[in-house]
Swiss-Prot record:
Family statement drawn from the similarity comment of this UniProt entry: Belongs to the helicase family. RecG subfamily.
Record Pfam families: DEAD, Helicase_C, RecG_dom3_C, RecG_N, RecG_wedge
Alphabetical list of InterPro entries matching this protein: ATP-dep_DNA_helicase_RecG, DEAD/DEAH_box_helicase_dom, Helicase_ATP-bd, Helicase_C-like, NA-bd_OB-fold, P-loop_NTPase, RecG/Mfd, RecG_dom3_C
Keyword Isomerase: yes
Family annotation (NCBIfam families): PRK10917.1-3, PRK10917.2-2, recG
Domain remarks: Has 3 domains; domain 1 in the N-terminus makes most of the contacts with the replication fork DNA while the other 2 resemble classic 'helicase' domains. The wedge domain within the N-terminus inserts into the replication fork junction, where the lagging and leading strand split. The 50 C-terminal residues extend from domain 3 and contact domain 1.
Bilayer-spanning residue ranges: none
Region (Wedge domain): 154-252
Name assigned to this protein: ATP-dependent DNA helicase RecG
Gene name tied to this protein: recG
Swiss-Prot/TrEMBL catalytic activity: Couples ATP hydrolysis with the unwinding of duplex DNA by translocating in the 3'-5' direction; ATP + H2O = ADP + phosphate + H(+)
Location of the Helicase C-terminal domain: 563-728
């Protein structure tokens, strides 16, 4: 047995100690080494150690040597103490690596993983049909069908330590078995005893277990089940327990729990995996370079897959998950690296920029640039004068001043003698950008054109001609810019606004209008770093992380649905003062399934019953783009006092007088969407308000909304949204398939994502064939 003789013995324990596993012991000691070494606590943990791994003599010796090394730390001088703590932490990692992971020993023939699942051990034609319902059709599918959960049966609780509501594993002898028949139910009861305590085990209408349990009478067994308190006697009992002989196969280990389909039980499923997974894992070829495995201390592919199905410890499971998550992210970054390298092959055109126009423009502005804007402009300019084509993502919060930075890039590009193409997702945004740009550049001899779907055929031809002969310096437009018959004389800069509405292919199509053009992508939605690396891994990232001084925050309030009339009255007062309001609903039309309001029905109600004295507009996703643009322009021009809408206005033109945003059923939106909606008001510099009108929602939804009301930083909100809703929901669409990672999680795996981005720089990507599914990053 492990000895605690090296630690002080003047200890006391608070009651009966619960068993401690080796990995828990190492985790606790690691925490102490990073904070303060407590030899009394280590001694207490040693007394509680109960782990089947301790039967390994080699482990016992190495663990004792480790404890010998740690015991002196509190008495050492500071410098030696720091050194020994560092070495102790390294020893913990070695102990984990040696004893907490099962390393596969492979022998025999390799298996073809594309083989039909029918030929797996224990499957056959009948089970093949059942497994197909789960998406398992080949041996590789079986290998990649990871458990949905795990059950830890390593800790053995004493019968007198049981607590109601807990699922536990305990042990003892079956001393009696009997069945009692009632009118609607048969109750099978077996009594488990450790010699001092007796606990009834109960099953309901499961008479078939009686024979099995009688065979185990008088024998030592392990029992796993949920502890209940008897409603009449108060005695603890275990319901629907799984009883295993002491020498059974599912004893003192972590068990995988798989998704099931009708006709196949968890026990049968587990058996199929146990019979096949070792040989399937041994048939895998290593996919990552050896130097990366060593550098990042990652498991080999065989041990990682095995650990996902049959982890020896939770440390083993986490290392397995880490390896496979890293690989998914590595392959994604590899794809982006290939795109980067392909672009760099062609080189860029170093632009000669003196900066005189930009300097003159900055002086003419009625405000000073923030330091973040200056830094962003300098990063973009450095790209433009370099020999590599720029591929940069510019992002910042709502109102952080991205447009001015883009205008400075246009001026630099013009000064160098090149044309600019500025693509946005909607005509109305194109019109807004066009008007702003014309106004901003009125002092300069820059010819700006607008090319959208509504542009007349004759005007289109005139613009196309001007682009071809170089008379037009800047063109602002929608998808019309990537039509085949749009050609440029000397395109040098492509700016794409609201990037997440365009795919990589559309971006590339516009870039291909010129030779070695610089590309600036602008995202209005603040994107967490992990999302930026995953969605825009082929781009460098510039963040405007500073808001202009003096910008007023929008006051945000949660209001219960039964006080919505007070909100309407507030809207009335603000409109009478000259303001305008948005009232947003999650649906276009009323839904029978969801108890939420819709834009159409509420428009009718608000127009007639609540605001008959005001002009109301209606906008939703079913309107054509032309109709949406018309309504939005009319609202911006003041023809409507209130705009009733769905989230189609989350990104739209500025409405300077709009200062009230009312969002009903806000729990139906992501926080990133809500933040964009809130950003629609207060753009004229006046006091602005955002009301979240909430009905009967769960605590989790309320927690999200409370977080939103207390935070105005778009990046914090984006991180929180990613954490709580995932990447697919974050953008409102399942984009790029990134929500389809089997293992990787963009919120928790930022470190792995950064590793992968760094590591692909060391790889020669020439000739590397990417998996078929990774080509999804090119989806337009």
């Amino acid at each position: 047995m492990l000895c605690s003789r090296y630690f002080t013995s003047s200890l006391f324990l608070w009651g009966e100690a619960l068993p401690t596993l080796l990995e828990e012991f190492l985790n606790e000691v690691e925490k102490m080494l990073k904070n303060q070494v407590n030899t009394r606590r280590i001694h207490q943990l040693l007394k509680e150690l109960d782990d089947p791994l301790l039967e390994n003599k080699d482990l016992e010796e190495k663990l004792q040597a480790f404890l010998d090394y740690v015991k002196e730390i509190p008495n050492l001088p500071e410098a030696r103490k720091r050194y020994r703590i560092q070495k102790s932490l390294e020893m913990i990692e070695k102990l984990r690596s040696w004893f907490l992971i099962d390393y596969l020993e492979c022998s025999g023939e390799e298996v073809d993983l594309s083989t039909d699942i029918q030929y797996a051990k224990g499957v056959g034609p009948n089970r093949k049909k059942k497994l197909k319902k789960l998406g398992i059709e080949t041996l590789r599918d079986l290998l990649e069908f990871f458990p949905r959960d795990y059950e830890d049966r390593r800790k053995i609780f004493k019968l007198n330590d049981l607590l109601p509501g807990e699922k536990v594993t305990t042990q003892g002898k079956i001393v009696s078995v009997e069945t009692k028949k009632f009118q609607n139910m048969n109750i099978l009861t077996a009594v488990l005893s450790d010699g001092l305590v007796h606990v009834p085990l109960k099953w309901f209408n499961q008479d078939y277990l009686q024979t099995y349990l009688k065979q185990l009478t008088g024998k030592e067994v392990f029992v796993t089940g949920t502890v209940k308190s008897n409603a009449y006697t108060g005695q603890y009992e275990i319901h629907n327990a799984e009883v295993t002989p002491k020498e059974g196969e599912y004893v003192r280990r972590i068990l995988p729990i798989y998704r099931l389909t009708s006709g196949i039980s968890q026990k049968q499923m587990r058996k199929i995996f146990e019979e096949n997974i070792p040989s399937l894992c041994c048939s895998l070829k290593e996919t990552l370079p050896e130097r990366i495995l060593e550098k990042r201390k990652l498991l080999g592919v065989k041990d990682a897959y095995y650990g996902m199905h049959f982890p020896k410890t939770f440390y083993h499971l986490e290392k397995a998950r880490e390896r496979l998550a890293y690989e998914e992210l590595f392959v994604l970054q590899l794809a982006f690296q290939k795109i980067r390298k392909e672009r760099e092959k062609h080189g860029g055109i170093p632009k000669k920029i003196e900066g005189k126009l930009a300097e003159e423009f900055i002086k003419s502005l009625p405000f000073k640039l923030t330091n973040a804007q200056k830094r962003a402009h300098q990063e973009i300019r450095n790209d433009m004068i370099s020999e590599k084509p720029m591929n940069r993502l510019l992002q910042g919060d709502v109102g952080s001043g991205k447009t001015v930075v883009a205008q400075l890039a246009i001026l630099d590009n013009y000064e160098a003698g090149f044309q600019t193409a500025f693509m946005v997702p909607t005509s109305i945004l194109a019109i807004q950008h066009y008007r702003r740009t014309v106004e901003s550049f009125s002092k300069f001899n820059i010819h700006v054109a607008l090319l959208i779907g509504a542009t007349t055929p004759s005007e289109k031809e005139k613009i196309k001609s001007g682009l071809r002969n170089g008379q037009i310096d800047v063109v602002i437009g929608t998808h019309a810019l990537i039509q085949e018959d749009v050609h440029f004389k000397n395109l040098g800069l492509v700016i794409i606004d609201e990037q997440h509405r365009f795919g990589v292919k559309q971006r590339e199509a516009l870039m291909n209008k010129g030779k070695m053009v610089d590309t600036l992508v602008m995202s209005a939605t603040p994107i967490p770093r992990s999302m930026a690396l995953a969605f825009y891994g082929d781009l460098d990232v510039t963040v405007i992380d500073e808001m202009p001084p003096g910008r007023k925050e929008v006051q945000t309030m949660l209001v219960p649905m039964d006080r919505v009339n007070e909100v309407y009255e507030f809207v009335r007062q603000e409109v009478m003062r000259g303001g305008q309001a948005f009232i947003v609903y999650p649906l276009i039309e009323e839904s029978d399934k969801l108890n939420v309001k819709s834009a159409v029905e509420m428009y009718e109600y608000l127009s007639k019953e609540v605001f008959p004295e005001f002009k109301l507009g209606l906008m939703h996703g079913r309107l054509s783009q032309e109709e949406k643009d018309r309504v939005m322009l009319e609202f911006a021009e003041g023809r409507y006092d209130i705009l009733v809408s769905t989230t189609v206005i989350e990104v739209g033109i500025d409405v300077p007088r709009a200062n009230v945003m009312v969002i009903e059923n806000p729990e139906r939106f992501g926080l990133a969407q809500l933040h964009q909606l809130r950003g629609r008001v207060g753009r004229g510099g006046q006091e602005a308000y955002c009301f979240l009108v909430v009905g009967d929602v769960g605590e989790e939804a309320m927690e999200r909304l409370r977080f939103f009301t207390l935070n105005t930083d778009g990046f914090k909100i984006a991180e929180y949204d990613l954490k709580t809703r995932g990447p697919g929901e974050f953008f409102g669409v399942k984009q790029h398939g990134l929500s389809g990672f089997k293992v990787a999680d963009l919120y928790r795996d930022l470190k792995l994502l950064e590793w992968a981005r760094e590591d692909v720089q060391e790889i020669d990507v020439e000739g590397i064939e990417l998996p078929e599914e990774i080509k999804l990053i090119e989806v337009g």
